[in-house]
Amino acid sequence: FENGHFTDVARNIYLLTKFGNNYKATAMFCGNYITAKSIVLPNSKVFLLEDNGSAALLDNDATLLWSGELKYRGGAAADIALYKNTLWASFPECNVLLRYNLSTMREELRIGGNKSPFSRPEGLFVEGDSVMVCNSGSSKLIQVDLNSYSVFEYEDFEEPIHQYVQVGDCRFAVLDSGLYLI
């Protein structure tokens, strides 16, 4: 996006970017490689999350190391993000963010719940020591400081926000009506 124009991307380049060097074998673990969420970890392992909450951790040669579910009170995780050595997941049905230990895949911390600052949290984007949380229920982008766990309203939209990302100086948001450069 350096020149301000979008460019078509070949399937293999998309898969390489999403799943890492062993993208062909890794993509075979996905029911739908387009909708599956993935994180290529610093050690080249890949964490996968399907829409139904099914999750897998694959070695760099696509060997299955762990499989299970990312669910909270019956609701599937909507998105995942990596911060340091932990995995964060959003659960829109419960208004919760959970932090998991990547070594044990055990829940370590919960933010939100009954009196939650979140309203249907979906997309997560880690930026420095903060995670940006897309609240589709309140149409707000929320910033969570990952050192103090303080929660701040960052930006308000006129319709639900589902995904947010920053690339260089450009910020993008996926709203109900489409993709926007903000």
Regions found by a protein language model. Name each.
Residues 1, 33-40, 74-82, 118-127, ...:
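Repeated scaffold domains used in trafficking and secretory/extracellular systems
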Residues 3-30, 36:
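An edge-strand/N-cap motif at the start of beta-rich repeat modules
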Residues 1, 6-10, 48-52, 89-94, ...:
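Conserved beta-strand positions in repeat-built beta-propeller and related beta-rich domains
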Residues 17-21, 59-63, 101-105, 145-149:
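Short loop/turn segments that connect beta-strands within beta-propeller blades
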Residues 23-30, 63-71, 106-115, 150-155:
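A short beta-strand motif characteristic of beta-propeller blades
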